[in-house]
Amino acid sequence: MKFFTALAAVGALLAPAVALPTPASEASHNQTLSVRLVRAGHTMVRAIVTNNGERPLHLLSFNTIMDENPTSKVDVSHEDGGEVEFLGMLPRYDLSDLTEDLFTRLAPKDSVEHLFDIATVHDLKWDGKYTLTARGAIPVAEDGGTDIIDHVYYESNALEMDIDARKAAMVPRAFDDYFSKGLDKRRPLDICNPMKEKALRAALQDAQKVATEAAAAAQNNTEKVFEFFRARDPGTRKEVSKRLASISGVATMDGGSVTWFCSDGPRRCSPRIIAYTFPARNEVHPCSLFWQLPHRTNECHRQDRIGTVIHEGAHNPNAVTPHCKDHGYGYNRATALSHQRAMGNADNYALFANARQLVFCLLHLFLALPFIYIFANF
């Protein structure tokens, strides 16, 4: 009897590890944090972020409207329905061992403002009316802490801006100096030293294998597809499989449709960026953290070089169209996304492809069984 009591204890431990978060309507969570977009110039925007709650918020800015890097902060559409191309970067951040300086503390009823110019990272090539919206989730830690415990959702007002394309073109874009060099000059082979080239080729080759295996699994593993993409229908399984197969196809340094660099030519790496992608150019640049990651992790849902290749591959239009964005990082956030957002989130494909790592999570807990059994006999 005590054995089954102990087994039940293990089951209780396992339940949180394998239970799926319930996807929440992001709009319905828009009461704690509000974001108001205000025009501050011809193409300048001021985002006013307000804590409407009764408790302080400890907010992590990575890949949100508060990000200081030239990232996608707002969705931009033109009145004629034409696609507004994003010209900025999509970074993958290291979320381990976060430090206090990476957070913004927002007291109850307080606001913080962020000013940015949409012309620096968007191709505003048409005259006329543009509509801007911001929607997402910001990771939150306990006040004074650095462990992510939740996310607060935000959905802004729709800001309409009449823009003169010629004036917008005069705004220096974030990466004009770099892109003006041309691909040949941007990729000096001597920068890719033998050690880095070997590591990158190994990551690409194994990412090919992992993504190919995941593409096959997506066709048949209905529950695993539901776990990561919130749908079981054949159409979803087929699309997930197709995208993973395409990601596998671009994971090569030998004449593929995505260019994998060995260096940070644009000089946009920071201490927390693992790698970043320019979707407008189908280019991926690793940072120093990429080389420090393990080739293949044996920890639950941890970042490694193989997963980073799959994640970054999903950001490139030559692999996935439309390219995936960063709606959420990590297992808990990724599996809490709605179906539509999960299908467009790069980390969901990396996590799905590496889902076999869940075995390690279960193994660690099963190893605790003897200790639980002993405890149950006291």
UniProtKB/Swiss-Prot annotation:
CDD domains: M35_deuterolysin_like. Disulfide bonds join C192-C262, C269-C287. One of its GO terms (cellular component) is extracellular region. It is an enzyme of class 3 (hydrolase). Residues 20-186 form a propeptide. Its main location: secreted. InterPro entries: Fungal_M35_metalloproteases (IPR050414), MetalloPept_cat_dom_sf (IPR024079), Peptidase_M35 (IPR001384). Pfam families: Peptidase_M35 (PF02102). One of its GO terms (biological process) is proteolysis. The active site is at E312. Its EC number is 3.4.24.39. Its cofactor is Zn(2+). Binds 1 zinc ion per subunit. It comes from the Eukaryota. One of its GO terms (molecular function) is metalloendopeptidase activity. Zn(2+) binds at H311, H315, D326. It is found in: Secreted. It catalyses: Preferential cleavage of bonds with hydrophobic residues in P1'. Also 3-Asn-|-Gln-4 and 8-Gly-|-Ser-9 bonds in insulin B chain. Keywords: Cleavage on pair of basic residues, Disulfide bond, Hydrolase, Metal-binding, Metalloprotease, Protease, Secreted, Signal, Virulence, Zinc, Zymogen. PANTHER family: NEUTRAL PROTEASE 2-RELATED, PTHR37016. Secreted metalloproteinase that allows assimilation of proteinaceous substrates. Shows high activities on basic nuclear substrates such as histone and protamine. May be involved in virulence. This is Neutral protease 2 homolog ARB_04336. It comes from Arthroderma benhamiae (strain ATCC MYA-4681 / CBS 112371). The lineage of its organism: Eukaryota, Fungi, Dikarya, Ascomycota, Pezizomycotina.
